[in-house]
Amino acid sequence: MVKAKTVYVCSNCGADSPKWIGKCPSCGEWNTYVEEIVVKEPVGKRALYGVSDGGKVRPVLLRDITSEEETRVDLGDRELNRVLGGGLVKGSLVLIGGEPGIGKSTLVLQTVLGLKGLRTLYVSGEESSRQLKLRADRIAHENPDCFILCETNLEQIFVQTKNVQPDLLIIDSIQTIYTEVVESSPGSVSQVRECSAAILKYAKVSGTPVLLIGHINKEGSIAGPKVLEHIVDTVLQFEGDQHYMYRILRSIKNRFGSTAELGIYEMRQDGLREVSNPSELLLTQNHEGLSGVAIAAAIEGIRPFLIETQALVSSAVYGTPQRSATGFDLRRMNMLLAVLEKRAGFKLVQKDVFLNIAGGLKVNDPAIDLAVISAILSSSLDISIEPGISMCGEVGLSGEIRPVNRIEQRILEAEKLGFSRIIIPHNNLKGFDTSKCKMQIVQVRKVEEAFRQLFG
């Protein structure tokens, strides 16, 4: 008779202990141990893919392995193909995470429905077949080779994969799938670990690419053990504010491509639309004559685009001035305010400062520092920045404007959108042929020089 025993498993890293521990000794997190019942079965009784290979796998010499370029599946979505590094590699396991309701299932379903000539199996553990049909009708795409399976038992899913023989497998979501090998509830650390390991083995043995949809926890990371992110080939993060129409697909881990890629979508009633030129959507046309607005030439991933930086500076009503930043690091904004006071002589100690990156984007590019302090100073002086001016540059603690990377892409993007002048760091044009650029390029060394160019 198989015996069951109780163990405590860390929900963050997957470490186990025979008794409850307040602080995990492996990852250092507090209060992450949860109780689970584990049933140890004989190896021969396990029916999962790859749990027991029966000694069939043998080591081979590295020189005997033929090296071939990996075959990629074109998903028909330029943004998704870009983030994946040119398409989906056969036999790869891709994890897509994001907040509830952000559009993960919509993104995957419309991609599957848009595929032609590929047999796909969409396994849903959260929605019924009728609910998926309603979603598919709203997207208005149709794939005659798309099979729908509403099942959460992993053993039954593998039975159906043998019958269907799909070219692409989608599982929505990994937290709803369970295996009979582990006696614990779906979504537990043990279930997620065992199921993901079995799915990985299926992908490698059959050569079928698999897309996993995963939930995120309150900290914003993928729910479940960290081993889930380690065993998959690619981790994609689908993010965005539900109050805005834009969604951003980022690559956190990619064994077959760059993690610097970025995909941008626009959420519509009929699904997600690819945004090939995000600058035209992120810039408004009605800010002329308004103070506190500066246009920054930013790069997210390897894509250049222009963003609108908005600032509001007002007298502090309460004793302690308020500092608020949306889409920008608050600590970095406080550092830039200190630079404004120390190096440029502008006193903002008794002022409330509010900063916003228009469009609901979260930007980590330090090259927008110059636009941030320019927008803040513009609002403080109540002087608008002349239309047609864009800028980029990192601001150092001594008030210097430091060079930024990919300056050519930033300049060409600003010129393409009709800007007549761009302010950039000094000596940032090495190797760039300015003759192919018609816009005026102004180079500055210090923040004071930039302010003289903007406000006279």
List the predicted regions and their residue ranges.
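Conserved RecA-like ASCE P-loop NTPase motor core of nucleic-acid helicases/translocases
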Residues: T120-S124
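P-loop (Walker A) phosphate-binding loop of NTP-binding proteins
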Residues: E99, G125
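Peripheral, non-AAA+ core regions of ATP-driven protein-machinery
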Residues: V2-N12, D16-R82, V89-L95, I102-V112, ...
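Divalent metal-dependent catalytic cores for phosphoryl transfer on phosphate-bearing substrates
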Residues: S129
